[in-house]
């Protein structure tokens, strides 16, 4: 019949196939197509899973680094300051006894100081502005006698918060964060080169160079004698 295409199975049967494989031709082609599509989907899913895993790992690493930086910053903030004499570097006190800082007088107030701070028992009246009636005792470094500031012994009512506090001049002290030093003892096998060791190494290299030159000269003489003997024979 015109316009009608004869359908045949794998055995050559026509559309009205009576063999047992009826419909298996089309089923096998559909199955292959579905398997191909499933394979493509599986590959795509694997690709997405790989990308998601990579992104998750990167995010996890970034979170860990951020947390580590935050911990280090918090630890740095919690480390106390140690105040040193600017003349001899003796420790005078630390920020654990910190009370306040005064920008107008350029000093800091501490509740207590170390034994390196000497107190002059001779009392005198303060000559600073807004400190009328304050009785002071001079503070000096026990090591180098540098004037460090004052301790308030008597104060008017409006300055009672300064009484028995140690006022250290910022110009007379230095400070560093406790635990901030990164210097470590270097073992003998990792000791850094200094000037003396460099001189010794250069001396040894010069001696080795002289020995090599002497050996080269002897080798040249031996080759010359051998060449002369060969020519003579």
From Swiss-Prot:
One of its GO terms (biological process) is cell division. Changing residue 141 to A: Abolishes location at the centromere. One of its GO terms (molecular function) is metal ion binding. One of its GO terms (cellular component) is chromatin. Keywords: Cell cycle, Cell division, Centromere, Chromosome, Isopeptide bond, Metal-binding, Mitosis, Nucleus, Phosphoprotein, Ubl conjugation, Zinc. Zn(2+) binds at residues 85, 88, 141, 144. There is a cross-link at residue 162 (Glycyl lysine isopeptide (Lys-Gly) (interchain with G-Cter in SUMO2)). The keyword Nucleotidyltransferase does not apply. InterPro entries: Mis18 (IPR034752), Yippee/Mis18/Cereblon (IPR004910). It is found in: Nucleus; Chromosome; Chromosome, Centromere. It comes from the Eukaryota. Residues 80-178 form the Mis18 domain. Detected in testis. Changing residue 85 to A: Abolishes location at the centromere. Changing residue 144 to A: Abolishes location at the centromere. It holds the Pfam family Yippee-Mis18. The modification Phosphoserine is found at residues 36, 39-40, 233. The keyword Metal-binding applies. Coiled coil: none annotated. Homodimer, and heterodimer with OIP5/MIS18B. Identified in a complex containing MIS18A, OIP5/MIS18B, MIS18BP1, RBBP7 and RBBP4. Required for recruitment of CENPA to centromeres and normal chromosome segregation during mitosis. Belongs to the mis18 family. This is Protein Mis18-alpha. It comes from Homo sapiens.
